[in-house]
From Swiss-Prot:
It comes from Myeloproliferative leukemia virus (MpLV). It is found in: Membrane. This is Myeloproliferative leukemia protein. Belongs to the type I cytokine receptor family. Type 1 subfamily. Disulfide bonds: none annotated. Signal peptide: none annotated. The gene is V-MPL. A motif (Box 1 motif) lies at residues 80-88. GO terms for cellular component: membrane. InterPro entries: FN3_sf, Ig-like_fold.
Length: 184
């Protein structure tokens, strides 16, 4: 049943017994009752007023509890908002307990640095100017060259001059393992 807001209605009722035990005719009509409906916003006003009264009474009750019974107030506050543990105290005690159980660590006072072998070996300048073996037919060196034989290949620091007249220095022809005496 939908009723329009701010309307007046007239109601009359009648009843009839209609069940498994009692059955009967309709009763007479009741006297008319006049009813007027409220506005749509009436319930919003009622709920707002009710919430305002309840919140103010709860606040007043908490203030009275705090002033008159501080022990009960602290107990209620602790039940509603439990306090967080102090992590410095809790974890500090835990770390002290575990440090007491663990064996003491050995301290190194004089630490020696381990010298790693170098991948590059610097040889002293020899007085004789004998060419080093560069071909497989000659005795092998301790290291491996990237190109098998360079004896017959002419070495140049720069390729021929370009049209711009500048020397390109990016061409090293993979001679990074050749001794410097061979370049002269």
């Amino acid at each position: 049943l939908e009723l329009r807001p701010r309307a007046r209605y007239s109601l009359q009722l009648r009843a009839r017994l209609n069940g498994p035990t009692y059955q009967g005719p309709w009763s007479a009509w009741s006297p008319p009752a006049r009813v007027s409906t409220g506005s749509e916003t009436a319930w919003i006003t009622l709920v707002t007023a009710l919430l305002l009264v309840l919140s103010l009474s709860a606040l007043l009750g908490l203030l009275l509890l705090k002033w008159q019974f501080p022990a009960h107030y602290r107990r209620l506050r602790h039940a509603l908002w439990p306090s967080l543990p102090d992590l410095h105290r809790v974890l500090g005690q835990y770390l002290r307990d575990t440090a007491a159980l663990s064996p003491s660590k050995a301290t190194v006072t004089d630490s020696c640095e381990e010298v790693e072998p170098s991948l590059l070996e610097i040889l002293p300048k020899s007085s004789e100017s004998t060419p080093l073996p560069l071909c497989p037919s000659q005795p092998q060196m301790d290291y491996r060259g990237l190109q098998p034989c360079l004896r017959t290949m002419p070495l140049s620091v720069c390729p021929p001059m370009a049209e711009t007249g500048s020397c390109c220095t990016t061409h090293i022809a993979n001679h990074s393992y050749l001794p410097l005496s061979y370049w002269q």
